[in-house]
Amino acid sequence: MSKPIQMERGVKYRDADKMALIPIKTVAVERQEILRKPSWMKIKLPADSTRIQGIKVAMRKNGLHSVCEEASCPNLAECFNHGTATFMILGAICTRRCPFCDVAHGRPVTPDANEPEKLAQTIADMGLRYVVVTSVDRDDLRDGGAQHFADCISAIRAKNPNIRIETLVPDFRGRMDRALEIINAAPPDVFNHNLENVPRLYRQVRPGADYHWSLKLLENFKVANPQLPTKSGLMVGLGETNAEIVDVMRDLCRHGVTMLTLGQYLQPSRHHLPVKRYVSPQEFDEMKQEALAMGFTHAACGPFVRSSYHADLQAKGIEVK
């Protein structure tokens, strides 16, 4: 499809259609050029998928979305089978068009005012004790969706008084002060915002985002809420070096971040950014030791680690790979 002159509201643009809208073009990779996955990247699917289907049905019934499905997470089967999911609020259409991400791009619809209550009830029905709430970027909203986050946090706590809530927020570009003012009034238990990759590759990997802005967002929340942990994550395998990853880790430490996730980037389709390298489990272990030596209190580093992968265990300091 050629580049649309005007995107239709509510239409999801994916793969080649989404990439056509990015200023820095990504050339589709031919099948023979795709790096072969090493043995440690093989996923064993669960024999029983009953619980997986149950969670999907609950999501559809309440009109909710999970980032697990929308972003094609490789851990979906494992997490759903254990009765956990990362809820994605504010719709399933992102105003950004990052070429590593499988979430659809487009003009999103008006946020569902009933979503906080539906989300809270679904979490109660699932009996969750720890929940991760994330969102698409909503550059079309004055507060970037911050009030919706706050409403969801309040609604979840009202129906689930003993729950712990982790939020994985967008960068609130151009509206950080207003967004944090709203979120600080009803803060989560863990505040997460991913840097995703190293600053040298930002223009290609995160078009529309700013490395230093993201660091400032994490720092400003920490200053306002010194008792609460802040968290960030990176993908490896996009062309960065291990030395650059270590430099980012140092930047995060300097900005008060205490929880870190590092995981292998996987290409969602041949139209997305290609995998440049597969990082070995041994290298991930070395990065973890480096992170802990720097002062991180929690560091989950491994090929299948994602920001919200076993987030409840990460928060307890239990090793996750």
From Swiss-Prot:
GO MF assignments: 4 iron, 4 sulfur cluster binding; lipoate synthase activity; metal ion binding
Stored PROSITE patterns: RADICAL_SAM
Protein name according to UniProt: Lipoyl synthase
Comment on bound cofactor: Binds 2 [4Fe-4S] clusters per subunit. One cluster is coordinated with 3 cysteines and an exchangeable S-adenosyl-L-methionine.
Cofactor: [4Fe-4S] cluster
Domain of life according to the entry: Bacteria
Gene that specifies this protein: lipA
Phylogenetic placement of the source organism: Bacteria, Pseudomonadati, Pseudomonadota, Gammaproteobacteria, Enterobacterales
Pathway: Protein modification; protein lipoylation via endogenous pathway; protein N(6)-(lipoyl)lysine from octanoyl-[acyl-carrier-protein]: step 2/2
Sequence similarity: Belongs to the radical SAM superfamily. Lipoyl synthase family.
CDD domains to which the protein is assigned, alphabetical: Radical_SAM (cd01335)
Residues noted as binding [4Fe-4S] cluster 2 in the record, renumbered to the chain: 94, 98, 101
Species name: Sodalis glossinidius (strain morsitans)
Enzyme class: transferase
Pfam family, one: LIAS_N
Catalysed transformations (reactions): [[Fe-S] cluster scaffold protein carrying a second [4Fe-4S](2+) cluster] + N(6)-octanoyl-L-lysyl-[protein] + 2 oxidized [2Fe-2S]-[ferredoxin] + 2 S-adenosyl-L-methionine + 4 H(+) = [[Fe-S] cluster scaffold protein] + N(6)-[(R)-dihydrolipoyl]-L-lysyl-[protein] + 4 Fe(3+) + 2 hydrogen sulfide + 2 5'-deoxyadenosine + 2 L-methionine + 2 reduced [2Fe-2S]-[ferredoxin]
Keyword terms of this UniProt record: 4Fe-4S, Cytoplasm, Iron, Iron-sulfur, Metal-binding, S-adenosyl-L-methionine, Transferase
Residues that, per the record, bind [4Fe-4S] cluster 1: 68, 73, 79, 308
EC number of the protein: 2.8.1.8
Subcellular location: Cytoplasm
Ranges for domain Radical SAM core: 80-297
PANTHER family: LIPOYL SYNTHASE, LIPOYL SYNTHASE, MITOCHONDRIAL
Xref: NCBIfam families: lipA, PRK05481.1, PRK12928.1
HAMAP family: Lipoyl_synth
UniProt-listed SUPFAM superfamilies: Radical SAM enzymes
GO CC annotation: cytoplasm
